């Protein structure tokens, strides 16, 4: 069984940076969630218009399909995606075992990072709309909240430590299921 990781959070929290680091350190196949957006979504965000649920469903389903395809190949994946609402995360995780890493920080820190970011279609003016709809992970979801305070390496180390603990749990569960089926 493969492991699929979604690095989530509002714009500017470091999703792509952490996802790329997981790819580099652990060899997981990486995809940038923004690359799955249809042009209409990019145009809307570029114009400073927040996406609606109806805008997001097709995008989330495409990311899910990508993870399913990698699962069929036995590949572990890591993808960056805002995954702001639980209903969005349910779409992402509906067909594959998924672990969410929620990067969390203060509005002020993230606003500062967004204002320093160059070449991205997501304008800083949309950040309040993302915080407004953000639903934290709940215990029923596989995942962990990671603070974005400190260095990138510290953030990545915390994320990988949590991911390794999850992977150990998954491996133990699979081993127990295999033993039960063999008995």
Task: List the predicted regions and their residue ranges.
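Conserved substrate/cofactor phosphate-moiety recognition/catalytic segment
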Residues: 13, 20-65
């Amino acid at each position: 069984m493969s492991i699929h990781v979604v690095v989530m959070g509002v714009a500017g929290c470091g999703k792509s940076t952490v996802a790329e680091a997981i790819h580099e350190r652990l060899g997981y196949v990486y995809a940038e969630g923004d690359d799955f957006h249809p042009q209409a979504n990019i145009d809307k965000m570029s114009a400073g218009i927040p996406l609606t649920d109806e805008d997001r469903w097709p995008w989330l389903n495409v990311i899910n399909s990508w993870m399913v395809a990698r699962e069929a190949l036995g590949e572990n994946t890591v993808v960056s995606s805002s995954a702001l609402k639980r209903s969005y995360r349910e779409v992402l995780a509906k067909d594959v075992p998924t672990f969410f890493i929620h990067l969390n920080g203060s509005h002020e820190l993230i606003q500062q990072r967004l204002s320093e970011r160059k070449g991205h279609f997501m304008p800083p003016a949309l950040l309040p709309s993302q915080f407004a709809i953000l639903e934290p992970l709940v215990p029923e979801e596989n995942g962990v909240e990671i603070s974005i305070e400190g260095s990138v390496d510290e953030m990545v180390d915390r994320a990988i430590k949590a991911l390794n603990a999850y992977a150990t749990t998954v491996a133990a569960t699979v081993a127990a299921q295999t033993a039960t089926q063999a008995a």
